[in-house]
Structure formats: structure tokens, C-alpha cells
Curated annotation (Swiss-Prot):
A biological-process GO annotation: tRNA wobble uridine modification
Binding-site list for NAD(+): 273-287
Organism: Thiobacillus denitrificans (strain ATCC 25259 / T1)
The protein's name: tRNA uridine 5-carboxymethylaminomethyl modification enzyme MnmG
Functional note: NAD-binding protein involved in the addition of a carboxymethylaminomethyl (cmnm) group at the wobble position (U34) of certain tRNAs, forming tRNA-cmnm(5)s(2)U34.
Classification via InterPro entries: FAD/NAD-bd_sf, GIDA_C_N, MnmG, MnmG-rel, MnmG-rel_CS, MnmG_C, MnmG_C_subdom, MnmG_C_subdom_sf
Keywords: Cytoplasm, FAD, Flavoprotein, NAD, tRNA processing
Amino acid sequence: MKFPESFDVIVVGGGHAGTEAALAAARMGAKTLLLTHNIETLGAMSCNPSIGGIGKGHLVREVDALGGAMALATDEAGIQFRTLNSSKGPAVRATRAQADRVLYKAAIRQRLENQPGLTLFQQAVDDLVLDGARVVGVKTQLGILFEARAVVLTAGTFLAGLVHVGLENFQAGRMGDPPAVSLAARLRELDLPVGRLKTGTPPRIDGRTIDYSRTQVQPGDDPAPVFSFMGDRSMHPAQRPCWITHTTVATHEIIRGGLDRSPLYAGVIEGVGPRYCPSIEDKITRFADKASHQIFLEPEGLTTHEIYPNGISTSLPFDVQHAIVRSIPGLEHAHILRPGYAIEYDYYDPRNLKASLETKSIAGLFFAGQINGTTGYEEAAAQGLLAGLNAALQTQGKDAWSPGRHEAYLGVLVDDLITRGVSEPYRMFTSRAEYRLQLREDNADMRLTETGRALGVVDDARWDQFNRKRDEVARETERLKSVWVNPAILPADAATQLIGQPIEREYSLFDLLRRPNLGYAQVLALPGGGAGVADVGVAEQVEIAAKYQGYIDRQNEEVDKHREQEGLRLPPDLDYTRLTGLSMEVRQRLQTAQPETLGQASRLQGVTPAAISVLLVYAKRGFKPDEQKKSA
């Protein structure tokens, strides 16, 4: 049957990418439908019970700055918060939270159910409906046709998902959920560039059977950091510690003894796993010289005893898993509640995507999340938001939007995907960004909220809060610049006590804040320092501006130098094989990739700086007709 209503945007999948995509499209006024195989699993944390981390926390803040749900949901569900790299510079500091799975799902579902313009429907999607080279809807398992002007596909690990435990395997989207077999087959019919990847998860432990006296406790930060720019510590539920233990020589012997029954090492699994979250089998093989590997025992929630042992992801047979767990200090009598497993699934080469995350070959069809070869909740959420807002923009007849590498980690993520593709599951790190000092967690709102408001994804409450914060940062900065101290006001003894050394001339408080040994609170203790600002985020912005503005200004100059070439658009129908002055290898790589901008072209493997110079010459000449393709 044909569903009586049609939609602007349909989102397929209710994970972290799908929920952000649906919310973003609906916030922009698009009539949106979210289809999921099971409404009870909306926003489920399929693997580890944590959000954030190095690079990942930056993405969460950017999603939040654009009105997304992940950060606020984490503030409402987080049972431990920590700032990683707190002793390092602000560019690489990152927030990480342990989340209660039940509370997190509830927070996401509450937002979905109360979002105007968003409809939920429980049905697995089996088919994409096309009109020529444009998607016009989807068909579900029951044969229901839903029509739409744009479709966002966020299928996670469900496309032809295959679960492995030892040499046993069976079809599943994740343990306990059916796979999307029909949809996977339909996508393969469309001749899109498909591959296989894999990921894994560890066995879960009953915390009542753990001897915590043999582990090291790891408490959260006090005071706890807050994830959302709209958040507050009062949102946080009760806080819980984590614990640290480690593998042993005996653990490694057990693993080596079971490798002949590992699907990974027996050649049963074809997909490539994540380099930066390897299975324990991979760890002891790749790092054979290490006597032990750290394991973090992470609570799954406030109302369960279940513990997630982060660091022993495995697809070894259950009897080997049992022996592994019991060889670990503190887990000698541990009871496994759920076995670990690996899952193999289809993904599609993201080089077939535009920067908007729309597929190049099928108009109106957007991909987000693990289908694009990424790993991680945060990477999925960021892509979902971008795909959802661009799907809405397309239905409104507006130009697509994607941030540049200098504007957001989201921009780095998308550019890496569509330019370089993936050979293994992609995860975000701060090291992937060229302009880290600009792309900090603390200034994600200053970088993106104004753009989000113009796009339509930022609501009035967030916009008002953003403007209040921006104004307060400006006022406090000017106040500190206007308050002066000199040796008469601050004698040598007092100066030595307060700031570590006497001052030899007059300084503004802002000048003194530039000193590496002085923080905001210490400057307020000086004569005329006053009460300062209560908002920790405002104080942080003021202090970072004082200490790092010189470096930031230099990086801005570097960005400006590259921006003109970076954003120079290349014709979509350009026949690179007919351009002279380029090597055959470069022409072939450009012809295959069809980069949208000169910046993307410059990051293609094998494309040299000399080749970019040649393209720049052609661009200035306007790519004359005799150098272009004569027909589409």
C-alpha cells in the first residue's frame, strides 16, 4: 500500500546518525519521517557506554553548537565526566563521559517524540524507490510505500550484517537484532561502490562477581565538566567511578592458544577492523612485546550491575572468552552476562559522496554514519546532522552546506571521507586537523552556532544563550583590558605572593593573563580584579583568547592564504584526461575522484603540488571549452 502522507525527508535508521539527521531536518521545517526496525532501540549505544574523547568530544560539541541532541542527552545520562589532556593545551583537551544506556536512550527518544514536524514509524526498509537517477521514496518489509523528496540512509552495521563468535556466524544487524538483508541486496543492485568492514565488542561482566580490591579505581572529575553549551551540572545523575585492570602473560597465552579458532585469523572475516580500537587478538599479535594491556571496567548504568570491560573486544569462541576474562586480575570469578562478538557489514565508498553527503550517482539520496566507513557514535552523529540538514535544504531549493577543514572537525571528517576514502573504519583524532588551535571544544559554538542559526537548525533558546555568552566574553575581555596595575598599586612583596614575581611597569589585567603561570582566578585576586564572571565557559574563552591570540592570529593568516585556492570550485563535468601538463597518473586519479574543489584535489593521493599549480592555471583561464568534455 501507499502511505497516505508524503514527506520532505525520510531517515532510515534510528541510531546516532539517524536520530540527529531526523531532528536536524525537522528543526529546519522539513516534514520528516524516521523509520526504524524497532522504536525501543532509538538512540541505543550498541557498543561502549561512553561519549566523547580525543577528537570525538570536539565533534559532540560541534553537533551541540548546531542544535543537535547528543551533548544534552549525555549531560542527562552521564554517570562519569572527565576532561582528557587537561594538563595540555586547549586545542587537544577533550570531554569524555560514561553514560547510563537506559537514560541516554530515554533522553534521545524524548527529543524525537517531542520534535515538531517529525513522525516516527516502526518498519524495516527493504527497498529504495527511484525515478531514473533520483530517489523518490522507500518500501518497507510490509510493502508500505513512503514517498519523499530526499532520503537519508543511516543503516549502521545492519547492511548484510554477519555476527561472528569463534567459527560460528549468523546474520544479524547487531546481537539480537535482524539484519537489513533485502536493503543491502537492493543497494548492491544500484552498482554503488561497496566493501566490507568489521567491528567488535567485548563480553559483558556481572559487576557483583568482580573483586574490585584487585583493580585501580578511576573517579570522574570534580567538579564534573558539562558537555552541552546549554547544559548544567544539575542535569547530571548520580556519578560512578570506573576501574582499571590489565591483561596478564596467562591471558596472552590463552589468546594465542585460541587463534586457530578466531574468525579473524582463520580467514572467515573478510572485513577490515578499526585500527584504533583493535580486538584483543589483534593487540597481542601486533604488539607481541607488550606484557599486558590496560582494561577499563566501565559501568553500564545506575540500575544495572553490568560492566563493560573496555579493551578486550573479541570474536574468539566463548570458552576462550571465559578463560580470558578469568585470567585478568579482579575478574578471576567473573560471570559473563553476554559474549563478545565481531560483526561484519557492508559500507559504501564515501568518495562517491558530495560534501553534503548526498550520493553523486543518485540525487536526493544521502548516506551518514557507518555506511560511509566510519566508526564511533560521535562521527555518526556529526554526519547524521549534516546529511539531515542538507536533505532539508535540498527540499527547500537551497544550496547545500558543509564546513571547511578550518571551520570544524566535521569539515575535516567529511573532507577526509570524500577525498581519501577509507581502507579501515575511520575515527576522528585531533591530529587529523591542520588548524587545531582554532577548532577547540570550548569555541565550537563561536565557530558554528551563527551559521546554524542562518541554516535553521538553531532554535531561539540556544540563539539567545549564545548571544548572551558572546556578549559576556566581549564585556569581560574589555573590562580586563581597562583595569591596570603598577608597582605602586601592587608592591613587590604582594606581586611575588600573588603572581610569583614583582612587576616592573604598568600592566592591564588582560596583559597579565597572557602569562603562562597565571590563570583567570589568580588575575581576579589582583587589585581591581573584581568578581569576574560566574560562567566557566565565558572565563575559559577569555583566558584562552589572552594566552593564545597571537598563535590564533597567525593560524588565521595561514587559513586566509589557503582559503582562496581551497574553495575554488572545479567544473563537475571536467574531462581531466584531456588536460595537458598533468601526468597520466594524476589525470586518472582526478578523473576517477571528480573532486568538487581545488582543495579536495590537493589531498588526493598521488596529486602533487605541481599538478595543483597546473589546475590553478586552467582555473584562471576558465577551463576553456576545448579542454572540457563535450557531452555529459
